[in-house]
Amino acid sequence: MTPSEQNIDKEELAKFSDLAQDWWNPAGKMKPLHLINPVRLKYIEQQITLKGKHVLDVGCGGGLLSEALAKHGAIVTGVDMSESLIDVAKNHAEQQQLNINYQCQDIEILTKDAQRFDIITCMELLEHVPDPQRMIKNCAALIKPGGKLFFSTINRNFKAYLYTIVGAEYVFNLLPKGTHDYAQFIHPSELTQWAESGGLRLLDITGIHYHPLKNEFDLSRDVSVNYLACFTHE
C-alpha cells in the first residue's frame, strides 16, 4: 500500500510524533491524556471483562491505554503509524515489565491477517484521520463475532469548539495549539451510521466531562463535547 493510499494525515502524524518524548510526562503536553485515561479504562471495564481478552489498541500512541489494559489482564496488541511513538511505547512497556505486542503498522494491513480480537479500542483517533468511516470499517473487520469495539471522539457543535479548541488549546493551555480541527469533529449520529454500515450495532454512548476546579475527567450523560461509544459485531 502506497503512502497516498493510506488513511493517514501526514501533518497529524508529524504533529503527534513530535510529542513522543513527552508522552509519559503526566505534567507535560500530554497531561489531558493522562487525566482522561482512567476514565476510558473505567468505561471499557463497565462493558466487558478484560482478563484474558485479546485487545487491539488502534492508534496506541506511546501506550497509555495499552499499558492500562495490560495491567488489568488483557493480552494487548498496540498499533500506530508513528515509529517514534511505537519506540516510546516499547521502551516504557519494557521498563514496566509488560508484554505488549507493539507494531508500527497500518490497520488495513492487519485486516489481511487471520487474527481477530475480542476487544478493539480506537481512542481520540477518528478526528485525526482523513477518512474516519474507513477506519471504523477496518476496525469492524478485525473484531470477533460478539466482540466489543470502543471509539472515543469529539462532538461537532459550538460548545465542543469552545471547550476543546478555544478553552483547552488557547485559554487553559491544556493542549498544544492546533491539536484539533473543528471540521474533523464527529456527531454521534455520524459515528453510529458509519459503524452500522460496517456491520456494527450500537450498545452505548456516554459522555466525558471535564471538571476544571477538580482538574479531572469523569463519565457523564452529556455527550455534547467528548464522548465514548461501544459497539458489537454479531
Curated annotation (Swiss-Prot):
E.C. no: 2.1.1.222, 2.1.1.64
Binding residues annotated for S-adenosyl-L-methionine, in chain numbering: R40, G59, D80, M123
Catalytic activity of the protein: a 3-demethylubiquinol + S-adenosyl-L-methionine = a ubiquinol + S-adenosyl-L-homocysteine + H(+); a 3-(all-trans-polyprenyl)benzene-1,2-diol + S-adenosyl-L-methionine = a 2-methoxy-6-(all-trans-polyprenyl)phenol + S-adenosyl-L-homocysteine + H(+)
Listed InterPro entries: SAM-dependent_MTases_sf, UbiG_MeTrfase
GO biological process: methylation
Annotated GO MF terms: 2-polyprenyl-6-hydroxyphenol methylase activity; 3-demethylubiquinol 3-O-methyltransferase activity; polyprenyldihydroxybenzoate methyltransferase activity
Functional pathway: Cofactor biosynthesis; ubiquinone biosynthesis
This protein's UniProt keywords: Methyltransferase, S-adenosyl-L-methionine, Transferase, Ubiquinone biosynthesis
Class of enzymatic activity (EC top level): transferase
Function text: O-methyltransferase that catalyzes the 2 O-methylation steps in the ubiquinone biosynthetic pathway.
Family assignment from sequence similarity: Belongs to the methyltransferase superfamily. UbiG/COQ3 family.
Listed name of the protein: Ubiquinone biosynthesis O-methyltransferase
Organism: Coxiella burnetii (strain Dugway 5J108-111)
Gene: ubiG
